């Protein structure tokens, strides 16, 4: 007798059910509260999202925020790789960097935003804060990934006089990649949260953070939720695209014969 397929609690069907259940709970809460100044339902939010997508200012705000935050992330990504390589090669470099990394990890993001407002214009602050918040995460994981490279393979590479590039490509990169990908999962979400928070506090014009601030001031709760939905959608798409590109580059670098 054929066994019935078991329900997979982590499968797509389960995830879809959980999402639909969350929407139902959201709609029920909106109906029970019955106050649009406190909570609006998903139907109203979806309608407002569609309206916003038809407005030019929406795309300008999304483009501005995406450009600034992605710039901050990419700069932090490159800086983390360089600093991790230096720290792995020279112990004194890690010692010198440690106070700065600890400071960024422990000081509240709001403090950095307020300080940055004294140094930078409101339209540049999101890139700076995104860079600052994700750098320690990327640096720590990149350093750990480099140090996890097999020492026996590195010694063999030294004996056979492999070039530095081949050592990096064939030994260090396969060890580094999982740590880097894990760090990017965390950092990509963190940079959007911190960057948009900076825009809200700085009241940056024509940015997602600025739109969220305006929605709060004018009690446009539908706009507040709609901009949040758009922000989440853009951040998810950016994360998926970057991780796909990272996997592609790593795999091609490892397989490359040169």
Segments from the language model and where they lie:
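Transmembrane-helix boundary motif in ABC transporter permease subunits
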Residues: 71-101, 114
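Short cytoplasmic-facing helical segments at TM-TM junctions of multi-pass membrane proteins
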Residues: 141-180, 212
